[in-house]
């Protein structure tokens, strides 16, 4: 799951197990968590969607029928322990994810600090938010014209080839850039 705004999908998955398979809510939630990874991208509070209870109730007031939970238990899925007046989509995602990660080591640390309230019994550095550093597949990411500038041929570019980037004559780099721009437009 990519960011908290996608967290409602976990409710649909849970509902299908509760209504379609006859599982009790907690068994369905555990199954969904065991098969869900949540990636948080935003290490600032403003980036985490939160909604007032009346708005959430308007769309999910039938939660007991839908997922087998009374309203107070349903609304608590969008909260850390202690609760607030708002339904937090990131907290909902974390209630249904067996693995949580940030998108870099630094972001993982920032997320541990920001989301620590979800795990009040843990020290901040024990908060189970891992870090996965995004990467690039150079062979498909690097345009053939840039590859030729870096390697002098059409062989697949390698990370070590970028050490030569500063040696590329500016007019040659500009020519390839403008050609790629023309192709894009």
Where would I find each of the regions flagged by the language model?
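Catalytic cores of carbohydrate-active enzymes across secretory and cytosolic contexts
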Residues: 1-185
